């Protein structure tokens, strides 16, 4: 690796600033190489967070040849940050996972092309331009594609999802058509999930009227419990969004130029618009693998080591489907955090240290306009019979805390947070250790991660629990830096034990 210079320094990872030290020669001196893995050619299909993280961690441990292939873009970027480019908060270059110099200096080769076919017998890829590419080990990290359900008119200009960089570019072009309509300007968004509400906020930031069609009787109610879902319903409408629940798309019609002009609903309503956003979920992007011989279901089937049915082929990220997911986890998790973890895990295995994928306690976060959302652990939309819940909501209706716990013994199982930030390490420790709800409430200030001078709500939450359960639990102390540091220090010592 004499041609690869040592690189130290900070790197922008999406909207997170992290320090990565790529001191390869030093790391090699401290990492025992496996002779069987020397000099391999590793090909990664996809350059999202899963594929990029796999490449990064393989490079930190080995000098294998690494080639990344993506049809979508030359420069890997943070998909979750695309909305902020449209809203003017970021420039496109700010979404790049790494600086421009990162790839060459770390000897990561990139090819911008589509993979048409995988030949598992020849260990060869056939690319769109007719070229072939051999591999010793293959990592499939090809992500997802937006769902379409055969609606009439779904191929008209101005009808799209929001997943790829090209979608953002198309959305910018459609915005010109919307604004040209003057007082008749309107965007219609179909689908009550995270991408749908992101798209609504994007148009709202440019003062474009939005109609939001949600099939369910409340926003994202297959994930959020009723109280939180209703809070977001209100919040969406507070922003002037025309939220229509229990409403489905039936047809999209266009004008003579092939552009969307109207949307028809199941209630017979006709909504004039210049844009129709289809945000009804995503599916693994695996059509090119149908004839490969690799076992598929909804996604690419993998075991706990992220191995597919074929030797030397792995799958990670949105396209991977675990055959036996851990308790509390789904077989397919199209989430940034899981893609990142999968990339690091498969890198360990490829570098000779076979490592099972153990994602741990479920975590996710999102933002609904002005309300931040976090979930740790098991907080289903419908409370199971073996659980109880403590739900507190601020009178203003924009903040809430939910803590689920077992009826027998009171062990805490999950946290749902709206507009309030809790420390992930603290919540996960309580869940892992099956800490009783009473002990959690006594020490709830340790979890609060809001800035120091923000108002704290632990006393109100505790008072509500006491009223509901006729108890007299009290906070053990106020939050302090020293207490939180000691708690996290103990956590670190236990993890290293």
Stretches with model-predicted labels:
Residues 37-41, 47, 319-425, 478-492, ...:
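Mid-to-C-terminal Rossmann-like scaffold of FAD/NAD(P)H-dependent oxidoreductases
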Residues 37-108, 202-224, 426:
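Beta1-alpha1 glycine-rich phosphate/pyrophosphate-binding loop at the start
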Residues 44, 48-49, 73, 144-146, ...:
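Residue-level detector of alpha-helix initiation sites
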Residues 64-65, 110-126, 133, 205-302:
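A Rossmann-like FAD-binding core segment of flavoenzymes
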Residues 155-183, 256-264, 269-345, 436-444:
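FAD-site-proximal beta/loop scaffold in flavoenzymes
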């Amino acid at each position: 690796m004499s041609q690869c210079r040592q690189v130290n320094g900070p790197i922008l990872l999406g909207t997170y600033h992290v320090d990565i030290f790529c001191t390869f020669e030093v790391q090699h001196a401290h990492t025992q190489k496996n002779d069987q893995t020397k000099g391999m050619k590793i090909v990664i299909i996809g350059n999202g967070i899963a594929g990029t993280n796999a490449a990064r961690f393989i490079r930190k441990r080995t000098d294998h040849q690494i080639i990344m292939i993506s049809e979508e873009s030359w420069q890997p970027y943070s998909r979750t940050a695309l909305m902020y480019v449209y809203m003017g908060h970021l420039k496109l270059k700010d979404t790049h996972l790494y600086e421009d110099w990162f790839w060459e200096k770390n000897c990561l080769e990139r090819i911008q092309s589509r993979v048409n076919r995988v030949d598992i017998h020849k260990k060869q890829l056939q690319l769109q331009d007719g070229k072939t590419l051999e591999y010793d080990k293959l990592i499939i990290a090809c992500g997802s594609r937006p769902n379409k359900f055969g609606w009439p008119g779904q191929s008209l200009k101005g009808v799209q999802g929001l997943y790829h960089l090209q979608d953002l570019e198309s959305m910018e072009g459609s915005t010109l058509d919307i604004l040209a309509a003057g007082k008749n300007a309107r965007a219609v968004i179909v689908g009550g999930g995270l991408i749908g509400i992101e798209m609504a906020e994007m148009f709202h930031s440019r003062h474009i009227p939005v109609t939001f069609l949600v099939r369910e009787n409340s926003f994202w109610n297959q994930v959020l419990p009723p109280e939180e879902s209703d809070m977001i319903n209100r919040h969406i409408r507070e922003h002037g969004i025309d939220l229509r629940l229990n409403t489905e798309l039936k047809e999209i019609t266009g004008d003579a130029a092939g552009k969307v002009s109207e949307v028809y609903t199941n209630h017979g309503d006709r909504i004039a618009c210049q844009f129709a956003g289809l945000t009804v979920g995503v599916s693994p992007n695996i059509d090119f693998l149908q004839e490969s011989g690799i076992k598929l279901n909804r996604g690419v089937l993998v075991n706990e080591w992220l191995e597919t049915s074929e030797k030397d082929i792995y799958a990670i990220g949105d396209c991977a489907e675990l055959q036996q997911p851990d308790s509390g986890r789904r077989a397919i998790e199209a989430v940034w955090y899981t893609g990142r973890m999968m990339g690091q895990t498969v890198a360990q295995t490829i570098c000779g240290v076979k490592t099972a994928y153990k994602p741990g306690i479920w975590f996710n976060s999102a933002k609904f306009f002005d309300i931040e959302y976090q979930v740790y652990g098991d907080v289903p939309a419908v409370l199971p019979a073996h659980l109880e819940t403590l739900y507190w909501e601020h009178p203003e209706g924009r903040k809430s805390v939910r803590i689920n716990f077992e009826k027998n013994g009171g062990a805490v199982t999950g946290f749902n947070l709206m507009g309030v930030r809790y420390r992930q390490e603290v919540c996960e420790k309580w869940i892992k250790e099956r800490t009783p709800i009473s002990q959690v409430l006594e020490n709830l200030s340790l979890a609060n991660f809001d800035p120091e001078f923000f108002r704290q709500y632990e006393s109100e939450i505790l008072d509500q629990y006491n009223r509901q359960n006729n108890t007299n639990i009290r906070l053990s102390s106020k939050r302090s830096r020293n207490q939180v540091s000691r708690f996290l220090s103990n956590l670190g010592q236990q993890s290293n034990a």
